[in-house]
Amino acid sequence: MIMVELEKRMDRPLPEDFVEEYRRRQAIELSRSVTCIPGAVELLKVVSRRKASICVASNAPRAKIDLNLQATDLEEFFQPSQIFSAYDVGKWKPDPTLFLHAAEQLGVAPKNCVVIEDSLAGIDAGIAAGMQTIGYAPTASQQPTDKVQFVHHLADLIPVLG
């Protein structure tokens, strides 16, 4: 859909390798600019020591998820079977399908899952999936509601999840 719009605006067809080249360049830029959220490594170490099932469930394509994990040195915490993309299930947050699929694959009941989300769509998906949902907002702009609490530092989750 976006490519069709670009072709209309440019009044010419895009090169056949446009999407591939765009993704390649995006990957290079992403690997240069993405940084790890402060406290993420410490939190993942604590949760891993507990032997809790953990995963990544993202709206992004799998290749982008993998690239982000590599660029932030977090790939050591996740096996391929613990990484889920909305592209795998054909449904994107705020639809809860991705979270429900991840829970099923990990053998964990939704009511026993904790979702940590940095997007409103993800928060809505976690709530709709019947999972305890915690919003991550590095600024104090987001306040707790009756359905979700927010943390502003991942280290604040260590006592809760550790």
Model-predicted segments: where are they?
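Short coil/turn segments at beta-strand junctions that form active-site/ligand-binding loops
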Residues: 51-53, 111-112
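Short, flexible segments with low predicted structural confidence
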Residues: 15-19, 55, 97-98, 129
